[in-house]
């Protein structure tokens, strides 16, 4: 009986997620400290998109690849790898269609960092990572994803226990924003978008991923434990050091 109720709850939550995504008027959402909301108005390509801009569909295989890469890193960090402390309650990240839709709209600007809001009714302070590609030939989508992950993975040399306990974007060894966001224990979901275009003889691409939360300066990236997942209600079957996807973590509550 319990399993039936849980299944019904998850189905209802999924239906609500999609219904909310379609019904929200982003122009009316609070947008503090930003010029505009990325979800407000009709989506159109910006002048920066050069010639032949095209927003690419991220298929299930691409979405699974992104989730696998992120959860692999989270699982690795949660068990205390790279000299980092173990995570007490870091959950498996799932795909979110609304975050992906806003990420897709962001990529149509063909500029990585902007002053646009990306908050939703469910996620009040989403984080964002942008990966820009430029080359003679456009690689396959999976190769773009792999390149983006490798770039973020290099930040493991910059991040320390001190950064985990007291977050800031930069330190003596360089930027840690990307990796720190991927391993935040308040991140519960992610959604990405991809746009490609031509700029003269160059092929360019912008891959954007929106996360359900972002790290806050001076606050912990995740809560430290004496053993991996010691505070989890239930561990994930695949990622043994992470909480399951149903772990009730509030992405809007700071550590």
UniProtKB/Swiss-Prot annotation:
Signal peptide: 1-23
Gene3D superfamilies: CAP (3.40.33.10)
Primary subcellular site in the record, as a coarse category: secreted
GO MF annotation terms: toxin activity
Listed GO CC annotations: extracellular region
Tissue: Expressed in salivary glands.
Name by which UniProt lists this protein: Tabinhibitin 1
Classification lineage: Eukaryota, Metazoa, Ecdysozoa, Arthropoda, Hexapoda
């Amino acid at each position: 009986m319990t399993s039936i109720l849980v299944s019904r709850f998850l189905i209802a939550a999924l239906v609500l997620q999609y219904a909310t995504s379609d019904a929200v008027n982003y122009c009316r959402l609070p947008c503090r400290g930003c010029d505009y909301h990325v979800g407000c108005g009709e989506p159109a390509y910006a002048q920066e998109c050069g010639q032949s801009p095209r927003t690419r569909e991220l298929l299930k295989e691409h979405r699974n690849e992104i989730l696998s890469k992120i959860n692999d890193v989270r699982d690795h960090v949660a068990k205390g790898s790279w000299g980092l402390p173990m995570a007490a309650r870091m959950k498996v990240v799932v795909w979110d269609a609304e975050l992906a839709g806003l990420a897709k709209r962001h990529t149509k600007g063909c500029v990585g960092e902007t002053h646009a809001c990306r908050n939703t009714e469910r996620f009040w302070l989403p984080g964002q990572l942008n990966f820009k590609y430029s080359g003679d030939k456009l690689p396959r989508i999976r190769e773009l994803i792999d390149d983006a992950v490798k770039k973020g993975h290099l930040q493991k040399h910059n991040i320390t226990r001190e950064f985990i306990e007291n977050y800031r974007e930069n330190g003596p060894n360089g930027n840690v924003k990307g990796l720190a966001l991927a391993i935040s224990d308040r991140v519960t979901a992610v959604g990405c978008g991809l746009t490609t275009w031509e700029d003269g003889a160059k092929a360019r691409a912008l891959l954007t991923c929106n996360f359900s939360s972002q790290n806050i300066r001076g606050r912990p990236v995740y809560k430290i434990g004496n053993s991996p997942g010691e505070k989890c209600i239930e561990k994930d079957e695949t990622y043994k050091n992470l909480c399951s996807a149903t772990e009730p973590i509030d992405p809007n509550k700071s550590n």
